[in-house]
Amino acid sequence: MKLMRIIWHGHSAFELQDSLTTLIDPFILGNVMCDVELDDLKPDVIAVTHGHSDHLGDTITLAQQTGCKVVAVNEIAKYLQSKGVDALGANIGGSIEIGNVRYTLVPATHSNGIDEAGFGWDAGSPAGWVISDTVVAYHAGDTGLFSDMALVHEMYKPKAVMLPIGGRFTMDINQALIAVKMLKPQLVLPMHYNTFDVIKADVGKFQRMVEEQTDAEVVIMQPGDFIDI
C-alpha cells in the first residue's frame, strides 16, 4: 500500500511526498531549525498558508528555480504571478486540483500581509490547507483556536494534522489540545514552536496531554525527520 511521507523541515515547513511532492510554507533561509538547503528541494507544488515572511519564506526563489506550481489564497497568488511565478489562486472553501491531489483552503484565525521593502501588499485571508491524496492531511497554518475546526473533521476527516503550539502568535499547547479534540486525527505533528524565544513550548507536555485525553498520537519530530502514514 502506498503511503504519504511527511517530512518536517523546522518551524511550519513540511514536505509531503505522495503522488506529488508538496512543500508547505517553505521558510528555509533564515530558519535556524531547517535541515535542508534550497537546492535540496524539488517540489511539484508549493502550498502557502499566508504572506508572513516565516511562511511565504523562499517560495519565489524555489518556484523560479524549479518551475513548480504554487497554490495560495487569491491575493497572494496575484502577488506571486507579478514575480513570474506559476501561481494558482483560490479562496476559503475552494479547492485546486493538480494531478491526483486536491488542495482545499480552510479558515485560519490570524493576520496576513506581505512586507516587501517597506511596502505592504494585501495578502487576503490567512488559511490552512487540507491536502487530499492517498490520505488526507491538514496543515493549520498560523492560527488561534476556533470552533470551526470541528467542521474540518466533519468534512475532511484528516488522518494527520500539523498544528502550531508555540503561543504568542498562534495557539499554545492548551489551546492546541482542544483543537485535537475537535479534529479527531490519528496523528498530530506539532509545529511553529522553539524556532524563536517568544514561541518556546513544552512539546513533551503537549504530547502527554493529548495522548492522555484523546486517541491521537503526537509525533515529536526533529528537522529532517519523517513519518509514513
Swiss-Prot record:
Keyword vocabulary terms for this entry: Hydrolase
Gene3D superfamilies named among the record's database cross-references: Ribonuclease Z/Hydroxyacylglutathione hydrolase-like
This protein's record includes keyword 4Fe-4S: no
A GO term for molecular function: hydrolase activity
Pfam families to which the protein is assigned, alphabetical: Lactamase_B_2
Domain of life: Archaea
This protein's record includes keyword Hydrolase: yes
Family membership: Belongs to the UPF0173 family.
Protein name stated in the entry: UPF0173 metal-dependent hydrolase UNCMA_04270
